[in-house]
Amino acid sequence: MSMSFSFQVEATQGAARAGRMITPHGEVETPVFMPVGTVATVKGIPQDLLEELGVQILLNNTYHLYLRPGVEQIRKLGGTHKFMSWDRSILTDSGGFQVFSLSELRKVTEEGVSFRSHLDGSSHLFSPESAMASQIGIGADIIMAFDECTEYPAERTRTERSMELTLRWAERSKNAFEAHKHEVPWFAERGKKSQALFGIVQGGMFPNLRKESAERTVEIGFPGYALGGFSVGEPREKTAELVANTVPLLPENKPRYLMGVGYPEEIVQYARMGIDMMDCVLPTRAARHGLLFTSEGRLTIKNQRFASDEGPLDPNCSCKVCKRYSRAYLRHLYASNEVLAQVLNTTHNLSYYLDTMRRVRQAIILGENSVSLPVVRSPHLSAT
Ligand SMILES: Nc1nc2cc3nc(NCCc4ccc(CCO)cc4)[nH]c3cc2c(=O)[nH]1
């Protein structure tokens, strides 16, 4: 079987790295921000526009696709790339986190997590084995081990038990993946290449549990490592401190993926700490609620002060929204609850995030120290 997945570091600056992942569906330049396309769509913008924005990898969610349209349906249609007509890279999360953030009546046992669908109340069980079977059937290029995202706050004993469960599930995930990885729908047509399974580090807010989880996850051995259990309501300073201490424990020749992060200033901060991949619903969800990120900070477009503002959303942005429409028009669309508001706002926010990451990558390669960005201290006050 030829090389399924590779990662090279191309330049470093301090802890930061500029790199390149190669998956069965193409190359991904890192550091990378991955738009969330939960049910095989990045809400509000079509695939050709995502390509125009330069998206090289996006997320799908196993939890959602398992419930609708179902893994079997997607597998029969050749996998999620064919299904959503996306010929670049895709990553799927393994479902455990979504069960806890979306479904009712969850019960965790050694076997896995039983839950009821948030769509129709039907009962289901997710286990490491079923999560691998689902992610193989869906067919993303990078898939995640089935883990337990330890809730916040959690006592040390609870966090340790949760970490141990995740480590046992990581072993089971890897064993199930190795046994079935050739069953991915596009195995033959992509040169007998298979998916890459990433491990997930837990350990909550305890530095020594984070260290133990990182070391034991690396001992199991994966082509890439995610930091889970963050962006779960903990103080952002706590996240930064624990990420800074955990990253050096991960192999420098493999990608590091910080799940569920974050604000524009955060993705710059974490890229500087040596994180290579990030994802968050923030830019797309915030767009749908009229919260827009610009080079001058964030703004809520429905604010009265934009009613007759003929200027662009962001004078320093080269996206097609900022090149064509006025703030007055964008405010009008949002106030009128027009569907075009969702499309234009999402296009801009994603463009801003992707452009920010491109600038960080350039700064690492060119050796510049500055990536000029708004360092917004108290986001809630500045949302005008
Ligand atoms: N498998 C796995 N997946 C995860 C996904 C996560 N996503 C997050 N945080 C996202 C939090 C988040 C949710 C919504 C918004 C929009 C504004 O409200 C922003 C951030 N933390 C996460 C932790 C894990 C984890 O341990 N394991």
From Swiss-Prot:
Zn(2+) binds at C317, C319, C322, H348. Keywords: Glycosyltransferase, Metal-binding, Queuosine biosynthesis, Transferase, tRNA processing, Zinc. Residues 260-266, 284-288 are annotated as: RNA binding. Binds 1 zinc ion per subunit. Pfam families: TGT. Substrate binds at D93, S94, G95, G96, F97, D147, Q202, G229. Catalyzes the base-exchange of a guanine (G) residue with the queuine precursor 7-aminomethyl-7-deazaguanine (PreQ1) at position 34 (anticodon wobble position) in tRNAs with GU(N) anticodons (tRNA-Asp, -Asn, -His and -Tyr). Catalysis occurs through a double-displacement mechanism. The nucleophile active site attacks the C1' of nucleotide 34 to detach the guanine base from the RNA, forming a covalent enzyme-RNA intermediate. The proton acceptor active site deprotonates the incoming PreQ1, allowing a nucleophilic attack on the C1' of the ribose to form the product. Transmembrane segments: none annotated. It comes from Koribacter versatilis (strain Ellin345). GO terms for biological process: queuosine biosynthetic process; tRNA wobble guanine modification; tRNA-guanine transglycosylation. Pathway: tRNA modification; tRNA-queuosine biosynthesis. The active site is at D93, D279. Belongs to the queuine tRNA-ribosyltransferase family. Its EC number is 2.4.2.29. It catalyses: 7-aminomethyl-7-carbaguanine + guanosine(34) in tRNA = 7-aminomethyl-7-carbaguanosine(34) in tRNA + guanine. This is Queuine tRNA-ribosyltransferase. GO terms for cellular component: cytosol. SUPFAM superfamilies: tRNA-guanine transglycosylase (SSF51713). InterPro entries: ArchSynthase1/Queuine_TRR, TGT, TGT-like_sf, tRNA_ribo_trans-like. Its cofactor is Zn(2+). GO terms for molecular function: metal ion binding; tRNA-guanosine(34) queuine transglycosylase activity. Homodimer. Within each dimer, one monomer is responsible for RNA recognition and catalysis, while the other monomer binds to the replacement base PreQ1.
